[in-house]
Amino acid sequence: MSFSPLIRQLIDGLRILPGVGQKTAQRMALQLLERDRSGGLRLAQALTQAMEGVGHCRQCRTLTEQELCPQCADPRRDDTQLCVVEGPTDVYAVEQTGYRGRYFVLKGHLSPLDGLGPEAIGIPQLMARIEEQGTFTEVILATNPTVEGEATAHYIAQLLSEKGLVASRIAHGVPLGGELEMVDGGTLAHAFAGRRPISL
């Protein structure tokens, strides 16, 4: 089916969202135009305001509309721990655990095949932040448990080791409430390698 230029532009715009393919974008566009024009206008206004008003925190690089995000602006946070994550969504996930330290947000993970080296993802800025702050005694590497995430964590751990700093890696393995028979072999191997004694 061929759409008019404005409808085609809307469909193409919606397709940039992760997980939204051609058919889903068409349904969304037609829903907004046919049944929810006021919702479409609210969406357009919210999107415009967010694109113009949201930037990156000058300390941790997460998304915020202020110079400092709420976590960096909070003087009650633990200045001895720094949690390194791959993206802003990871900050929100870690916050739900009750973590009270500081953050540094990389711009993804190392991926030489995609042209993403240390500079592209912000590792020099991470090292500068650690040096400038001077209070971190532990750097928690909370990159994703993928090949690239592991390589990124290993690379950062080596840099930290050269400076005499302690790096720790978040544990991963069998999910809470999960069944062993449903867990893939690689995940189970990580869980066995990371096992720890039961404290009574």
Curated annotation (Swiss-Prot):
**CDD domains to which the protein is assigned, alphabetical:** TOPRIM_recR (cd01025)
Return one GO MF term.
DNA binding
Keyword Lipoprotein assigned to the entry: answer is no
First and last residues of each zinc finger (C4-type): 57-72
> What are the alphabetically sorted keywords of the record?
DNA damage, DNA recombination, DNA repair, Metal-binding, Zinc, Zinc-finger
Q: Keyword Zinc on this protein?
A: yes
Task: Pinpoint the Toprim domain residues.
Answer: 80-175
User: Might you name a Gene Ontology BP term for this protein?
Assistant: DNA repair
Cleaved signal peptide residues: none
Question: What does this protein do, in the record's words?
Answer: May play a role in DNA repair. It seems to be involved in an RecBC-independent recombinational process of DNA repair. It may act with RecF and RecO.
Family, per entry = Belongs to the RecR family.
Family matches, as NCBIfam families: recR (TIGR00615)
Classification via HAMAP family: RecR
The name of this protein is Recombination protein RecR
What does the record give as the organism's lineage? Answer: Bacteria, Pseudomonadati, Pseudomonadota, Gammaproteobacteria, Pseudomonadales
